[in-house]
Design a protein with these regions (language model features):
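Helix-loop-helix junctions within the multi-pass membrane cores of secondary transporters/permeases
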Residues: 71-163
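Helix-loop-helix hairpins and the membrane-proximal interhelical loops
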Residues: 1-49, 56-73
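Alpha-helical transmembrane segments and their helix-entry boundary regions
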Residues: 40-43, 54, 69-70, 97-101, ...
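Hydrophobic, membrane-facing alpha-helical anchors
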Residues: 18-24, 51, 107-121, 159-176
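Intrinsically disordered, low-complexity non-transmembrane regions of multi-pass membrane transporters
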Residues: 1-9, 123, 184-185, 230-231
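Membrane-embedded alpha-helical modules
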Residues: 126-216, 223, 227
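Juxtamembrane membrane-interface segments at transmembrane alpha-helix termini
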Residues: 52-60, 81-88, 173-180, 206-207, ...
């Protein structure tokens, strides 16, 4: 059987790419009052993180200090370090630069596409992974830049509810992930983790900002998950 290459990887990423274009348009339209299309393009090229870019735009809107923006992006994207570590185990014999290239463009969705491919095969060609990553990368870049250009033509983009686009996407992801987790993790443990996140969030709101409360509550929830797992 012929080994799958770059174009097969790009084809496998088409559902992700289409989703990135739509979410990218929403991100660009929302960010239009605060950044130019060129600035948004540079943000997408060098940051390339949907949730982090939405957070950046929210912080830019309130004129938050650069240090706060950088720390927020770092914490939001920290999970990608773990995803890259795991993905690299399937490319042990690939060169360092190839692995750096794959890890630099890895996202939650392209990682999911990789895991889906590995469910049907034991080995993935690095070029397949580059196709998977690059198709999604270009789609996000195009979506955000076009969205920013269009946003400048809309007097009040909030009326379209586009600011809820990423939230809606994550609700869908969480719902599907919750169903999968139920098969491996007892429901009572999931409820304990949710309780820790909820209670700690409202307690933290009394001493820190909302954005920091979300981040710290998430870290506490992760800690609770590790303790309950016992590993």
């Amino acid at each position: 059987m012929k080994e799958k290459g770059f174009w097969e990887g790009a084809q496998a990423a088409m559902p992700t790419a289409l989703g990135y274009v739509s979410i990218g348009l929403a991100c660009g339209i929302i960010g239009a009052p605060y950044v130019t299309p060129i600035e948004m393009g540079l943000m997408s090229l060098f940051v390339y993180a949907g949730s982090a870019q939405f957070a950046m735009l929210a912080l830019i809107a309130v004129q938050a200090p650069v240090a706060a923006i950088a720390m927020t992006v770092f914490l939001i994207n920290l999970r990608l370090f773990l995803l890259s570590l795991h993905a690299s185990t399937y490319f042990r014999h690939t060169s360092l630069w190839q692995n750096i290239g794959m890890s630099s463009l890895l996202t939650d969705e392209t990682y999911g596409v990789l895991m889906g491919e590995l469910a049907h095969t034991d080995k993935v060609n690095p070029m397949w992974m580059h196709g998977n990553n690059l198709n999604s990368y270009v789609a996000w870049f195009v979506g955000t830049v076009v969205g920013t250009a269009l946003g400048g033509l809309l007097p009040n983009p909030e009326i379209f509810g586009l600011d809820f686009a990423l939230v809606g996407m994550f609700i869908g992801i969480f719902a599907s992930q919750f169903q999968i987790m139920q098969r491996r993790i007892p429901v009572r443990n999931l409820l304990k983790i949710l309780a820790v996140v909820t209670v700690s969030f409202f307690l933290l709101l009394t001493v820190v900002s909302q954005s920091l409360a979300v981040l710290f509550a998430t870290l506490l929830g992760c800690t609770m998950g590790v303790l309950l797992d016992g590993q």
